[in-house]
Amino acid sequence: MSLSTKLAITDVDLKGKNVLIRVDFNVPLDGDRITNNARIVGALPTIKYALEQQPKAVILMSHLGRPNGARVAKYSLKPVAAELSKLLGKPVKFLDDCVGPEVEKACKEAKGGEVILLENLRFHIEEEGSAKVDGKKVKADASAVEAFRKSLTSLGDIFVNDAFGTAHRAHSSMVGVDLPRVSGFLMKKELDYFSKALENPARPFLAILGGAKVADKIQLIDNLLDKVNRLIICGGMAFTFLKVLNGMKIGDSLFDEAGSKNVESMMAKAKKNNVEVFLPVDFVTADKFDKDAKVGSATAEEGIPDGWMGLDCGPKSSAKFAEVITTSKTIVWNGPAGVFEFDNFAKGTKSMLDACVKTCEAGNVVIVGGGDTATVAKKYGKEDALSHVSTGGGASLELLEGKALPGVVALSSK
């Protein structure tokens, strides 16, 4: 899908209007205390820009956690209102619902660029369209979903979607607001980077894929093999490739039985498309999956003995991967090279990160998919040293898999 044809917040006039913004304020809470406010900070450029345009009001809506279509006090967005007020340096009015006559009245009467935060969208089953009751999936009533969407629509004159993290969900607040729909700055930044990589990358284009299971990445690998020039396969899933392709002894390392059936066809596609594939040639091993495990080493040639497992790639692999990274122009990285949470098995991932930072400094583009790889960048304080660290794990993965994201499709075209 082309992402460059959608309207952005800067393409529309917000003066005197109620600007309804779908943000991602799904922040971690410890009681009433927000333990990481990064997602609130991420939405500030869009909120501040909207306020500068002299709107009637800025109305913010978000989900938090998984309250499963019911009102659950610990998932209230009320603590977020206080934090946002502090960050904006102006009052934020918190409403204790997100739809209904009282909310509609408060938004209608708002004036002078007032900032309003609505209560958690997911307190209503109509937001996600279903909920789990006693382990069974219960669907929301279609007419109730329609009424919920109608009430949300009535709150604004223009709808801004800045919640990339939920763009892969066809939820009411993402696709059901019947207003002109534009992207906010965070959403636009995500889409710009991914469209640059997927539609018009500087080459050589490298994808680095790590993580545990091949089966989880089949669609991703298949789509990227039509786009990239180079592919590094690392992390736990490398063992499945090495065992299938070279008959390598992998000891107690991860082996993905389901994913293994696709290895040969993927390699055949890589060969057909002239994609160079790089696999680890040596490993840091452990006698158990534990941060205090005994540490050993092994090569792909010798194999890993029984009773041992590979938890990281070794120094030769790291050196080769660094060379591939620093000679590529566009890099998409999804999945770590080893169990970086354990210090003894973090070197491969850290080496990869260092190479990515170095190639960025040389003017190349490095995009980090959300999830674990974003955690790696954060752990080592390198988020700002990379071109782009995605805020959406699931959403970025689905984009890279070639899927259309409902929240993006729903944006108005230029």
UniProtKB/Swiss-Prot annotation:
Species in which this protein is naturally found: Schizosaccharomyces pombe (strain 972 / ATCC 24843) (Fission yeast)
Family statement: Belongs to the phosphoglycerate kinase family.
Positions bound to (2R)-3-phosphoglycerate: V23, D24, F25, N26, R39, S62, H63, G65, R66, L121, R122, H168, R169
Name of the top EC class for this enzyme: transferase
Modified residues (Phosphotyrosine): Y75
The protein's name in its UniProt record: Phosphoglycerate kinase
Lineage: Eukaryota, Fungi, Dikarya, Ascomycota, Taphrinomycotina
Residues at which ADP binds: G211, G235, F340
CDD domains for the chain: Phosphoglycerate_kinase
Reactions the enzyme catalyzes: (2R)-3-phosphoglycerate + ATP = (2R)-3-phospho-glyceroyl phosphate + ADP
